[in-house]
From Swiss-Prot:
Belongs to the archaeal Rpo11/eukaryotic RPB11/RPC19 RNA polymerase subunit family. This is DNA-directed RNA polymerases I and III subunit RPAC2. GO terms for cellular component: RNA polymerase I complex; RNA polymerase III complex. Signal peptide: none annotated. Component of the RNA polymerase I (Pol I) and RNA polymerase III (Pol III) complexes consisting of at least 13 and 17 subunits, respectively. Its main location: nucleus. DNA-dependent RNA polymerase catalyzes the transcription of DNA into RNA using the four ribonucleoside triphosphates as substrates. Common core component of RNA polymerases I and III which synthesize ribosomal RNA precursors and small RNAs, such as 5S rRNA and tRNAs, respectively. It comes from Danio rerio.
Length: 112
């Protein structure tokens, strides 16, 4: 349990009467870097009807992330899949970068 005054990284906000397919998630301590990348990954899903985010105020590091799904799919499912897919993309980019850096350094060493 979070201590008094401490926020969770992710909060779920459902309006009264809304189903599980129409949810706003609040991502604390995040900005456009995660927001736009995650929105892109989530919108690739056929189950998603709408996905968007807003930053409530420039002085707050908080994103309101809205997901609406089709056919009764819970909004948490495309969020989870989007986060996993984005993690996979980041891992691939990091591995490719490290491999190319290793090749570059080996090439530099062989030239000296």
């Amino acid at each position: 349990m979070a201590e008094l005054g401490q926020k969770h990284a992710l909060e779920m906000v459902r309006t009264d009467g809304a189903d599980e397919g129409c949810v706003t998630f609040v991502l604390n301590e995040e900005d456009h870097t995660l927001g736009n990348s995650l929105r892109y990954m989530i919108m690739k899903s056929q189950d998603v009807e709408f996905c968007g985010y807003s930053i409530t105020h420039p002085s707050e590091s908080k994103i309101n992330f809205r997901i609406q799904t089709r056919d009764g799919v819970p909004a948490s499912e495309p969020l989870r899949n989007g986060l996993n897919n984005l993690t996979d993309v980041c891992k691939h980019v990091l591995q490719t970068f490290e491999a190319r850096m290793k090749e570059f350094k080996e090439q530099e060493e062989s030239m000296t």
